[in-house]
């Protein structure tokens, strides 16, 4: 690894034993791919696949009017450009969207009434604006009305066919009732069930059930067709009153002989009466040449005819197909001399009489009767005719407009029924229904396994694209109705396509989906991990999904098919447990919506490099080995027997039988869980809490990556999109806190590409959860960067790695009861050094509207407000940046006109003297709410178009334009530099053909040689008209200048387009004149009551901040930072934290050694130490070859501790941790002697102490602390409102009242229950008394007592209060 690339990439000591087979895929790829497939934005119209928008338009169009005289046809759709950038949309409260335009064709036909044919009279084609559609940002989110939202993918039951049974609960006999259901995406559901009497019933859309054969007859099958399909036939011969059956191995196998059968020639007994026809018997019969097996006549009586039986002489029907042969019919057969008949083979085991029984029950004979019967059952009130009924059935299952199985449904149907219809066929076929019934009967006969609806082969993911597609379709169908009505109401000849199409219903549906759908959620933006996991979340709730109340235990449970697809750990605690889950690290969603996971292919016990992505239903019976199964150098398994999974069960199998192998140990868990080191040593419940709490961690002001990591940190930081990443290779030419300019290398593939990129960094932006989003550059000027390199860290990242918390020294010991019940004792140093300090940003908004009484005004001239309150406002009435504000301070001054009131003569006089102001306006300024104090860091002003801008607005705009100008100038400077270098390479040494002047001075005369030094003296533009003696070189030079002009013009155009937005003003909501947003930043220092946690679910609340001198300390005087309770470990079974603390201790002591060697400049020892630590990661020769400067730079990275990487399920072993502790000179037990800071005495026991990664969670005491003296009251009960948001009071329940009574605090209690609560008159009297200085309580009757008496009166009880004096 070159020294240059080591600069920004942290090297960690690796403990993983397994090679990386496949990279972790893009973590938010699912969102981007799904929406990309929906829009197909960059695809030319003619090459678009029939998915997403294209599919919807093609399915709804063409729209024909009711008379079929005109048709509106869809040609193509296209998108316009983006009007505002993402940042502008967030600031202005707009939606980040692009306009959609569709090209449609209106075709008008001439109808020939005599022949009934039509000919085209007129075609009009037009492109129409079709509303706007939100666009996904690069990070997989949407900006809707200025807020960043995520559309969560839904996990729902796939369409297709499902087989199930009732486990014998429905019928009293305990017989199991088997059923199946065909579920389409759109259209009617069909249920098929076999009742305990073996009759096949069907129901359509859960209506009344009917015999299944009625539907078969309605579809055009005759009784003979049905019987032929479901049964095999047997031929029966009648010879001289003896009855024989045709010899057939299949039908005889397993049956009993009803008569003795002998060898026709030798007379030997082949099978005795009552014995079973087994393999040997059948073989003997075959060799004996028996082709007719004798049976008893009574075996034929009761059999079912397979074909109609008639008297050949008279044509009289004796019995029809499907009838049972009675004794009378059998006698007639003998009388008429019928020698051969066909019966159905029914043995009661493999072949039952279900269909025959159903046919006898169905009572319809013809197709017409069957159609009318079904129509009447589904539409009971409507008059039925065969034509209407036929049309109805066709629409029900066979017309794509009304019935859609979807490609997934057809795939599942084919897979389950063994059919082979093309996936593009999305309606049912007649054969599918027959196959479904046949499969169901077979399932019942064999008592086979039914489908598990919780198996991931039967559940699929609907991502953003599909969810929006369904909504868009609803909108289009609404629009289709309106278009049809318009076409029939007006004369179509005079209309253009735009007169027919109104895109409002479609836009409304899209807006509703993004704004109010349960699956479109406000993004959890606490930290990069919470963003990433929110985008990878799968929810079983939402429209068309489950509800919390109805979801049972089975749906929520972990299923074997979740392996590698859904994380078994990460899910919320509470009512949503198991319904909201997370995608596993390597999982991806395929085109059909099924979750796939990668496996390595094993061929002849050799593990190949080939990777296969498999959905759950294809995994089936493949034996799959674990990722950590030992493999030799030749790629074969070391052990002859390997642990493998077969159909979800673990077993030991032969290495030669293994077909697939996991790619990585952490493919089982999600991203959050794979960030927990030693996860394998934690109990699942605590791991669940650990992965959930990492998402609540607040980004700190100073970040540091964990010393003990898992290697996934850099992947999350890269894919979350919070860090700034280089897109192309190049060199950093400029860096400051707000921007990075990178000059790119010449791209041979695209020589016209822009040679420079300016990366603008976000500074102190407020996130959705009020945390601070800030970029910090980590590159230096002159540094080389490759694509994918991190240029600037975002929130909670450090050197391109996720850094949610801090590495702190933790001791496990009790300390004065301050760590009782998971409390955490914290050292003062953490607070003093701002280790856990975080910055939070609040946004306050004020709007000046045009009211009925006049315009509101934002101004610094506010009536009845003292001068000291306005000291921080500027002349526009907006608070200055940098002002320290506290609750009640004015942020933006605003006055609102009051209604005119009758003035007294005195007021009139005052008004005349002091002017109009003051009296007719009221102060409605924006003030700082209680509980917020901080520094004003930004203010944004938006003015409506046509309204004059104030000074502050102009200042803000000038500042923004200055930044844009700087970007433009930097870009042009790099373009000029690149041009100069190209010209230098091209022209140096050439002879000049035209003179070159600088002002009036001639620098180059004709015929002079061009030198390299010349290019530094003369501006590049001077060379534009230069010609040299070589024509080809002159031509190349002109081409370079052409490129230069194109690039510079493009830069300038982009700049002009950007600043053109500043002139006119903003598009604000109706009635709004001006909108001001003020941002206040607050520093939150770690304080008592804050919630903290480790990564193993070990959470607690800070109980006390202890002075440094009282903390336990090491022999060298170093104090610990934090004291945790050792009793929190054994019962919780999260031992991972102990291993983490030991490895953290090793990391820290090794860092101390490196630090000491650096200070003492012992470079030889340092190289030895680094080689010993990084024995696998960096070749010893490379460390040996480092220069002193390079060595110091590299080693100083590890002064505070050597960073370790211990992957999940493949981490550091105990022996390795011990070896590292020994290497660092610490005790192998990981324990140390600590001294009590209060007494200076060593503690009796050795104490487990080391470095743990601790997080500060988003439950901060400053946000929860709240106090009230007076405030709002409820209207009915007149009691104070509840909660911090309502500025409410604290409720006292009956138990609190009992407690006060028990203490005998009668007066305090009376005050609580009256004046402090809902005694209105008493409140007023109390106020008056306090003003007069008489602190005497004078309570009255509480309002809630009056509410009670009113309720009693409503019940007819007359309740009156008898006052004391009335009594007397």
UniProtKB/Swiss-Prot annotation:
It is an enzyme of class 2 (transferase). One of its GO terms (cellular component) is DNA-directed RNA polymerase complex. Keywords: DNA-directed RNA polymerase, Nucleotidyltransferase, Transcription, Transferase. Its EC number is 2.7.7.6. The keyword Ribonucleoprotein does not apply. One of its GO terms (biological process) is DNA-templated transcription. Signal peptide: none annotated. The keyword Transferase applies. GO terms for molecular function: DNA binding; DNA-directed RNA polymerase activity; ribonucleoside binding. It holds the Pfam family RNA_pol_Rpb2_6. It catalyses: RNA(n) + a ribonucleoside 5'-triphosphate = RNA(n+1) + diphosphate. DNA-dependent RNA polymerase catalyzes the transcription of DNA into RNA using the four ribonucleoside triphosphates as substrates. The RNAP catalytic core consists of 2 alpha, 1 beta, 1 beta' and 1 omega subunit. When a sigma factor is associated with the core the holoenzyme is formed, which can initiate transcription. Belongs to the RNA polymerase beta chain family. This is DNA-directed RNA polymerase subunit beta.
